[in-house]
């Protein structure tokens, strides 16, 4: 029984993920000192942060051997041109091929997108060669 518990605990620890903001990431000298290699690290999209700081955080994480997965909040994306720009920046500057799609914290959309499904239906992530998309659902709203 103890062996099964230890195996379960080990698998649980090996498969967890964590979320950072560019600001919090700036306080960490090396992620290798605080996280196991290959950990998936979600990068929160903070509307008052510029997209370049989020892309730089993703690049740093990927360069250090982690799986950067930035947030794409639908309601904060003005239009397809902005979505294309963000996808291109993450893909070409940071080597990102995974993303977390969510509606976002705004109650009303800033532009053309209201939900994560609309981001998927745009086809932009497929066109860019993204390999994995996660979707966040908040039944109570987000």
What kind of region is each of these model predictions?
Residues 2-142:
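Active-site beta->alpha loop and helix N-cap motifs at the rims of alpha/beta catalytic domains
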């Amino acid at each position: 029984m103890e062996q099964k518990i230890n195996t379960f605990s080990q698998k649980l620890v090996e498969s967890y993920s964590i979320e950072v903001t560019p600001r919090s990431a700036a306080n960490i000298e090396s992620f290798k000192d605080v996280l196991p290699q290959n950990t998936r690290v979600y990068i929160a999209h903070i509307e008052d942060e510029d997209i370049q700081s989020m892309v730089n955080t993703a690049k740093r994480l990927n360069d250090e051997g982690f799986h950067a997965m930035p947030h794409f909040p639908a309601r904060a994306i003005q239009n397809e041109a902005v979505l294309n720009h963000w996808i291109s920046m993450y893909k070409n500057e940071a080597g990102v091929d995974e993303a977390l799609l969510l509606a976002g914290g705004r109650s009303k959309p800033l532009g053309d997108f209201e939900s994560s499904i609309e981001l998927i239906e745009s086809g932009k992530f497929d066109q860019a060669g993204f390999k994995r998309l996660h979707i966040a659902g908040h039944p109570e709203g987000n």
